[in-house]
């Protein structure tokens, strides 16, 4: 047990890497990329207008399937597990909440800043070259979903240190309080619809809190029957709420803005993660699985941010050619989906090679030495303003450029660049252990 944690009465430190969480994240990321490849379908209408259809989401049979495949809550559960462990390790070394937020912000926004800058430059050039503005808008919208997810994830991680403190004092009361806020917003959203977007914070912070509980589950030691009962109960309650007409049965509809149904899915998925942990551990312990998951984990944010813009770009460019465009939902359209997925993966490879290093964990040093907390807060504002604007008003080319400038400003304010990792002990001779090396960042970082 780490002495600082023993003195503080905290739980023992967890291992730097949990292969089950790595595997869960890999599964989630793969499912997101595959799912989006099956959904996006740009349509060129006879009158010349261009729209984007969600062909898969419009299928009635897909509604019950998405109850299982809506894995966004699992992302936040995993983020809560690793985030809490990372924060406790940092705090034990004397790190502050602002230092934690600084590192989290930087790792997330650095690859996003490059994405926005590249998209703005490329699309502006295409517009000047005479490409139809409708096609430009279709391509611009490709960054919309990554931005809303980034805003929600950053909000949850930004609040993690103080939510972890509340969790340490009263874990169940903290979860109950966040759940009450979610329900209150859901009740008031019919009266004042913009209030619904408060659940972008409340829902995902509550799901993240489930990750805290899972991280400390060794103390609770729930049995397999209890975990199975939690899964059944949460899904039964979810089904009842849908049956009563209080919520849509389509989890894609419930995603933006999120509501109580996503929290209930998070409860079920957190319980499933623990219930199937022994089997998942055996799979994750296979050498080839471990290598694959570890490799993908290093570039997970790059893959997540870029896959949808690349898919939108590929689809939009095809509209400018005479390449056959089968109608969405037809047999020819379905047969073409595997080819679309292969093309997206092929496009991701050079992107990862060029920009994947931006996810490298910043070199640890004394927490915020000479850097006031105001700089971190200003960087957070610079990131959240364009992201929230995109959530409310949609992403336009102008907002894309403004977002790129704001994200670049945030990176400058945080004042770090990717450099080779040098252990803290080697530089200062301090007795405190260094933070995990970059290969572990897939697990201890978001």
Locate the predicted segments by residue.
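Alpha-helical transmembrane segments and their immediate juxtamembrane cytosolic regions
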Residues: 2-434, 438-446
């Amino acid at each position: 047990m780490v002495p600082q944690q023993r003195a503080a009465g905290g739980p023992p430190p967890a291992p730097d890497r949990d292969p089950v969480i790595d595997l869960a994240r890999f599964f989630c990321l793969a499912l997101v990329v595959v799912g989006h490849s099956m959904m996006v379908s740009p349509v060129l209408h006879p009158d010349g207008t261009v729209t984007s259809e969600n062909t898969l989401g419009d299928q009635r049979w897909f509604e019950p399937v998405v109850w299982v495949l809506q894995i966004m809550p699992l992302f936040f559960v995993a983020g809560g597990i690793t985030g809490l462990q990372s924060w406790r390790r940092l705090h034990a070394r004397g790190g502050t909440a602002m230092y934690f937020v600084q590192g989290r912000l930087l790792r997330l926004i650095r690859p996003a800043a490059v994405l926005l800058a590249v998209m703005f430059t490329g699309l502006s050039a295409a517009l000047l070259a005479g490409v139809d503005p409708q096609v430009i808008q279709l391509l611009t919208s490709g960054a919309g979903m990554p931005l809303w997810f980034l805003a929600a994830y950053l909000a949850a991680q930004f609040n993690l240190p103080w939510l972890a403190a509340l969790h340490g004092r009263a874990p169940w009361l903290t979860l109950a309080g966040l759940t009450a806020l979610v329900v209150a917003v859901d009740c008031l959203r019919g009266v004042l619809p913009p209030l619904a977007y408060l659940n972008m914070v409340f829902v995902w912070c509550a799901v993240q809190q489930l990750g805290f509980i899972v991280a400390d589950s060794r103390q609770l030691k729930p049995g397999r029957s209890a975990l199975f009962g939690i899964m059944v109960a949460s899904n039964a309650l979810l089904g009842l709420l849908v049956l009563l007409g209080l919520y849509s049965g389509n989890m894609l509809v419930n995603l933006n803005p999120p509501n109580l149904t996503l929290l209930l899915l998070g409860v079920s998925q957190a319980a499933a993660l623990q219930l199937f942990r022994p089997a998942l551990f055996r799979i994750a312990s296979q050498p080839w699985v471990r290598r694959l998951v570890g490799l993908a984990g290093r570039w997970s944010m790059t893959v997540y941010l870029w896959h949808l813009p690349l898919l939108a770009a590929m689809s939009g460019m095809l509209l400018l050619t005479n390449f056959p465009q089968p109608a969405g939902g037809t047999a020819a359209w379905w047969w073409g989906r595997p080819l679309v997925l292969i093309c997206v993966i092929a496009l991701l490879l050079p992107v990862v090679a060029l920009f994947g290093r931006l996810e490298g964990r910043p070199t640890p040093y004394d927490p915020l030495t000479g850097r006031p907390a105001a700089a971190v807060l200003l960087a957070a504002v610079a990131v959240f303003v364009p992201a929230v604007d995109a959530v409310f008003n949609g992403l336009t080319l102008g907002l894309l450029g403004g977002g790129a400038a704001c994200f670049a400003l945030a990176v400058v304010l945080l004042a770090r660049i990717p450099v080779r990792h040098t252990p803290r002990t080697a530089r200062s001779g301090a007795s405190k252990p260094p933070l995990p090396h970059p290969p572990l960042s897939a697990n201890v970082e978001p």
